[in-house]
């Protein structure tokens, strides 16, 4: 269920009740349950592998790229081309963290995992 700002304010002030509120569930328990579900959904999206035929990664953002020609997973990004006036041309190319890669066939991409926390 989606709430807009006004519905959320009414819920927090006790003036309305969401349809998916469970019997005897407090507002705090409801919000914890909803945020847990949202966190699980975000985690699933982070682990999603996306074909480049369906969707390209965001420009100039490091992602994991899969090379079907044998290199496997690479770190790279989609570099946009610009004119002398710094206007996008609509053209782009793959750029890789490791140089000197030739004959790559990027078929899939995924969001980079978060770096481990210090001391973990």
Curated annotation (Swiss-Prot):
Protein name (database record): Uncharacterized protein YfdS
Any Gene Ontology biological process: response to oxidative stress
Native source organism of the sequence: Escherichia coli (strain K12)
UniProt similarity note: To the N-terminal region of phage HK97/HK620 Gp37/hpaH.
Gene: yfdS
């Amino acid at each position: 269920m989606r709430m807009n700002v006004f519905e959320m304010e009414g819920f927090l002030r006790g003036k309305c009740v969401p349809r998916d509120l469970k019997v005897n569930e407090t507002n705090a328990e409801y919000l914890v349950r909803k945020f847990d579900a949202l966190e699980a959904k975000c985690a699933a999206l982070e682990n999603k592998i996306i074909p480049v035929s369906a969707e390209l990664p965001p420009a100039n953002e490091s992602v994991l790229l899969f090379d079907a020609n044998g290199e496997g997973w690479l770190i790279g990004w989609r570099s946009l081309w610009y004119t002398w006036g710094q206007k996008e041309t609509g053209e782009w190319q793959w750029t890789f963290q490791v140089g000197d890669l030739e004959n790559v066939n990027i078929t899939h991409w995924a969001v980079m995992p978060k770096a481990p926390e210090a001391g973990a």
